[in-house]
Amino acid sequence: MTPRRKSRMTVILFVLLGISIASALVLYALRQNIDLFYTPTEVVYGKNEDATQKPSVGQRIRVGGMVVAGTVERDPKSLKVKFDLNDIGPSISVEYEGILPDLFREGQGIVAQGVLKTPTLLEATEVLAKHDENYVPPELDAQMQKVHKPMGVADLKGESERDRQEKAYQKTSMQEGQK
């Protein structure tokens, strides 16, 4: 190998090594800042009920679900709030210190972002409330659709409750008209 080729090979090797190290550092930094989305059931049992895919204590995560009615506890001397969050299965507790969104209520859907302190306790740094009363986060909707059969026309034998009421009203008004 000539000295010129040797120096080119050395430069190329150092450039590739530098790119590899930079890529590894970027991926490491991104890995620590990624907040994965979980439902309360997935926090307790793991994704797809696989215990190996449970979030670990100390991990930053986002949890989406509904605020359980009757579980909101406010500290009168500070902005600390504790409440339970659930979807279709077990619930987890969420602790948050700060001003809650205006749309935060019991029975409302929220997304809490924070650090998992115990397997069923999330210390939230941010709480986001939904804006539409019919909104359900897509991940939570998919989980709920797996377990709950959606109410639809098929469940009502081809007619809704309103259709049944209208038919009954028409039937009674026709009977009164014949008298």
From Swiss-Prot:
Family of the protein in this entry: Belongs to the CcmE/CycJ family.
InterPro entries, A to Z: CcmE, CcmE-like_sf, NA-bd_OB-fold
HAMAP family from the UniProt entry: CcmE (MF_01959)
Function: Heme chaperone required for the biogenesis of c-type cytochromes. Transiently binds heme delivered by CcmC and transfers the heme to apo-cytochromes in a process facilitated by CcmF and CcmH.
Main location, first listed in the record: membrane
One Pfam family cited in the UniProt record for this chain: CcmE
Location relative to the cell: Cell inner membrane
Topology relative to the membrane: Single-pass type II membrane protein
Listed Basic and acidic residues bias regions: 156-169
Entry binding sites for heme: H131, Y135
The keyword Cytoplasm is annotated on this UniProt entry: no
Full protein name: Cytochrome c-type biogenesis protein CcmE
Gene name tied to this protein: ccmE
Gene Ontology terms: cellular component: plasma membrane
PANTHER family: CYTOCHROME C-TYPE BIOGENESIS PROTEIN CCME HOMOLOG, MITOCHONDRIAL
Record key words, sorted: Cell inner membrane, Cell membrane, Cytochrome c-type biogenesis, Heme, Iron, Membrane, Metal-binding, Signal-anchor, Transmembrane, Transmembrane helix
Transmembrane segments: 9-29
GO molecular function: heme binding; metal ion binding
